[in-house]
């Protein structure tokens, strides 16, 4: 066999001719100046607002200000490596995040990248982080309860699936503890096979210490709650753009469940820090400041985020996304700019007070100032029956307690009312990590409002409650099951409960 050189060279020339012709067209710009996490870029003529751009070292940024002569880009990462004169290229993609069930049990950053060291994420698809909220027609009024497992909230300030309920209070009043207990309370629901019953949880940590977030994730893991939760973390050491973006990323992950006929709850902890990060970005981008130096659109920042929590109607799959935003106040000032904004956007607020917290009333819920504007329609019949009474009695108690400080000679009726009120207040206390099921709460509150605690010394109320619950769980499980399944306290069940409580009260001393 002879090798013909001419033939081989012809073949090689033919192969080489088309090599390296796949040229890539990218629109680029140049960095004019960079500092404080903001880059001014010249060029990038056709860039869209909110588009991802990429710097030479691979760092991503987002185009926010589109001006006549330059583009203001916020940088998602450190700006140390970025120098004046470097090129910036368009990605032609608006900022998006991975969504899907593969994210459950994972901890991610504001861009959806894993930060828990458990390898890459198996996501279903990528979705834009900033999308329009559902309109009026796809929505439905809130009608299913979202149980937190806390007596003070489930009885007095009930939350429904698809509601937005604000948790507001000073630092160290137990705001995150309420959110954490709510996540832990969903464990029995998520153990069931029916997707309509499950409630997936998304926790967004904004501007918190890394140690705090690590502790939170550790508790979730120990309690077996991480498997149905997603944690999005943009900690205090992350750049402001990441802290601004994290709630939107978390919301997109939660919307995946809402739009696929499932249910999710998202906790933004906390939105004050997001507003501060957004203020920092806006001032550095030279946008005009407004009240408290926040930009004019800080209300829109929060309203467009919280409007995405919704209960959808049957034609849309009947899914829901419940939002529990957290706001930290300074010295109980609820009339500051951000707190008033978020109060006006949400469907109610749980107001936590330092004074109550230090008096040992935990959860430190101020029942007088807290409201739930739509949740009562989602309450179970059983809870409605027992909770209506406790609300009135506590309101009367608060009014009387204020007067009782001045006068010592009180008539018997007032004395009885004060006595009952203090015991009900004691009854609503609850230690952390011990959420109660709906039917258990109903029985305990029923015992309180029907006067079975009145004769007890205050210190014995907790012991009475624990004893009653263990008796009901042990010997009257059928009663608890009936209340749970019918979601109602029928006359028959009430009679059984009365017999059980009376029997227990006799033996308890």
From Swiss-Prot:
Family: Belongs to the ATPase alpha/beta chains family.
SUPFAM superfamilies recorded: C-terminal domain of alpha and beta subunits of F1 ATP synthase (SSF47917), N-terminal domain of alpha and beta subunits of F1 ATP synthase (SSF50615), P-loop containing nucleoside triphosphate hydrolases (SSF52540)
Gene source species: Bradyrhizobium sp. (strain BTAi1 / ATCC BAA-1182)
Protein task: Produces ATP from ADP in the presence of a proton gradient across the membrane. The alpha chain is a regulatory subunit.
PROSITE patterns referenced in this protein's UniProt entry, alphabetically: ATPASE_ALPHA_BETA (PS00152)
UniProt gene name: atpA
Coiled-coil residues: none
Topological relation to the membrane, as annotated: Peripheral membrane protein
Pfam families in the cross-refs: ATP-synt_ab, ATP-synt_ab_C, ATP-synt_ab_N
Subunit organization: F-type ATPases have 2 components, CF(1) - the catalytic core - and CF(0) - the membrane proton channel. CF(1) has five subunits: alpha(3), beta(3), gamma(1), delta(1), epsilon(1). CF(0) has four main subunits: a(1), b(1), b'(1) and c(9-12).
MF term (GO), any: ADP binding
Annotated keywords: ATP synthesis, ATP-binding, Cell inner membrane, Cell membrane, CF(1), Hydrogen ion transport, Ion transport, Membrane, Nucleotide-binding, Translocase, Transport
An annotated GO cellular component: plasma membrane
Name assigned to this protein: ATP synthase subunit alpha
HAMAP family: ATP_synth_alpha_bact (MF_01346)
Catalytic activity: ATP + H2O + 4 H(+)(in) = ADP + phosphate + 5 H(+)(out)
Location in the cell: Cell inner membrane
Site keyed Required for activity: positions: 370
InterPro entries on file: ATP_synth_asu-like_sf, ATP_synth_asu_C, ATP_synth_asu_C_sf, ATP_synth_F1_a_nt-bd_dom, ATP_synth_F1_asu, ATPase_a/bsu_AS, ATPase_F1/V1/A1_a/bsu_N, ATPase_F1/V1/A1_a/bsu_N_sf
Binding site for ATP: 169-176
EC number(s) from the headed UniProt entry: 7.1.2.2
């Amino acid at each position: 066999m002879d090798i013909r050189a001419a033939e081989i060279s012809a073949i090689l020339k033919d192969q080489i001719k088309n090599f390296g012709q796949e040229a890539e067209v990218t629109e680029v710009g140049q960095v004019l100046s960079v500092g404080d996490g903001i880059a001014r870029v010249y060029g990038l003529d056709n860039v869209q607002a909110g588009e991802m751009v990429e710097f030479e070292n691979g760092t991503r940024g987002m185009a926010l200000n589109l001006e006549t002569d330059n583009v203001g880009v916020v940088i998602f990462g450190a700006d140390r490596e970025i120098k004046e004169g470097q090129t910036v290229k368009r990605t032609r993609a608006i900022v998006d995040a991975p969504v899907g069930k593969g994210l459950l049990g994972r901890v991610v950053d504001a861009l959806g990248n894993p930060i828990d060291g458990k390898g890459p994420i198996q996501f279903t698809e990528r979705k834009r982080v900033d999308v329009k909220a559902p309109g009026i027609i796809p929505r439905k009024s809130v009608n299913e309860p979202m149980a937190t497992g806390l007596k003070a909230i489930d009885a007095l300030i009930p939350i429904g699936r698809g509601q937005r309920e604000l948790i507001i209070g000073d630092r160290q009043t137990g705001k995150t503890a309420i959110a954490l207990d709510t996540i832990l309370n969903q464990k029995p629901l998520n153990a069931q096979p029916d997707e309509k019953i499950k409630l997936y949880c998304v926790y967004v940590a904004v501007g918190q210490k890394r140690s705090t977030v690590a502790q939170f994730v550790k508790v979730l893991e120990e309690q077996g709650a991480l498997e149905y939760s997603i944690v999005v973390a943009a900690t205090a050491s992350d750049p402001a753009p990441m802290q601004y973006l994290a709630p939107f990323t978390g919301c997109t992950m939660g919307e995946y469940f809402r739009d696929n006929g499932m249910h999710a709850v998202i906790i933004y902890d906390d939105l004050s820090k997001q507003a501060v990060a957004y203020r920092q970005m806006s001032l550095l981008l030279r946008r005009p400041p407004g009240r408290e130096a926040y930009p004019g659109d800080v209300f829109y920042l929060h309203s467009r985020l919280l409007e995405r929590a919704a209960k959808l109607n049957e034609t849309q799959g009947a899914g829901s996304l419940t939002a529990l935003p957290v706001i930290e106040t300074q010295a109980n000032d609820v009339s500051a700019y951000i707190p008033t904004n978020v109060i006006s956007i949400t469907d109610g607020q749980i107001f936590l007070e330092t004074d109550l917290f230090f008096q040992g009333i935990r959860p430190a819920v101020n029942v007088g100032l807290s409201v739930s504007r739509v949740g009562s329609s989602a309450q179970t019949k059983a809870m409605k029956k027992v909770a209506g009474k406790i609300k009135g009695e506590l309101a009367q108690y608060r009014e009387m307690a204020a007067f009782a400080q001045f006068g010592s000679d009180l008539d018997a009726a007032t004395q009885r009312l004060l006595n009952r009120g203090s015991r009900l207040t004691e009854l609503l206390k609850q230690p952390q990590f011990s959420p109660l099921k709906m039917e258990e709460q109903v029985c305990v509150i029923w015992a309180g409002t029907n006067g079975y605690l009145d004769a007890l010394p205050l210190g014995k109320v907790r012991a009475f409650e624990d004893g009653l619950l263990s008796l009901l769980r042990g010997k009257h499980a059928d009663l608890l099951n009936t209340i749970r399944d019918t979601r109602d306290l029928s006359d028959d069940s009430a009679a059984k409960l009365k017999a059980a409580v009376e029997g227990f009260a006799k033996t308890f001393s």
